[in-house]
Regions:
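A conserved FAD-binding loop/helix module that cradles the flavin
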Residues: 26-43, 47, 172, 184-189
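Short hydrophobic core segments
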Residues: 11-21, 44, 176
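Alpha-helix capping and helix-loop boundary segments enriched in small/acidic/polar residues
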Residues: 4, 8, 27-35, 71-74, ...
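Glycine-rich phosphate/pyrophosphate-binding beta-alpha loops
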Residues: 22, 29, 59-62, 159-161, ...
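An anion/pyrophosphate-binding glycine-rich loop and adjacent beta-alpha core
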Residues: 43, 49-148, 152
Length: 189
């Protein structure tokens, strides 16, 4: 598929490797670039291949979406940042989540989905660390003192896809696959 013009072009080949991203853009909120739209899955399906495990999608829980978009890195929580719900409560508490905000991504994402609103609280962060290691987030907080930094999970990685053999071949002769377009390699998470 030609990106300019959108017409289909045929290039005969003895071997083809599907190596493309997942389909993050089927979700309104994703960490994927705009071109990750499931094209590899569609090509595989057009060749008659089954897709498996497509219901398993990993969500990245650390995305600021308002007042601007930005990813935060988990080590920020080692330096005093916490997640709070719309009532101001820290919902990733020790009783239920021993590792708090540093639980596995799927655990944090599910906890966030259960809340009405999730806010990033930076009040406990060392300011020098924040300015040095996360200058864009520090600037966002400084430039918007009356607006909370709102967090939500975003679609990140499809665990399912094209079934493979150990040599990356598929059930279609000459068609191989690797990368996120493949399925059954990563389990449900």
């Amino acid at each position: 598929l030609a990106l300019c013009g959108g017409e289909m072009r045929v290039y005969p080949a003895k071997t083809v490797i599907l190596c493309c991203g997942g389909a993050g853009n089927v979700y309104a909120a994703t960490s994927n670039t705009r071109d990750v739209t499931g094209d590899g899955y569609a090509m595989a399906a057009r060749c008659g291949l089954p897709l498996r495990g497509m219901e398993f999608v990993q969500f990245y829980p650390y995305r600021i979406y308002s007042p601007k978009r930005a990813d935060i890195f988990p080590d920020l929580f080692d330096h005093g940042a916490v997640l709070r719900n719309e009532k101001g409560e820290r919902f990733m508490d020790c009783a239920k989540y021993p590792m708090k905000e540093l639980e596995n991504r799927d655990v944090v994402a599910r906890a966030e989905f259960a809340e009405k609103e999730v806010r990033l609280d930076l009040s406990g962060c060392d300011k020098a660390y924040l300015e040095r290691e996360c200058p864009n987030i520090a600037r966002m907080a400084r430039d918007n003192p009356d607006k909370p930094l709102l967090i939500r999970p975003v679609a990140h990685f499809f665990m399912g896809g094209v079934p493979l053999r150990t040599d990356c071949s598929t059930d279609v002769a000459g068609l191989y696959a690797c990368g996120e377009v493949t399925g059954g390699l990563h389990g449900a998470n």
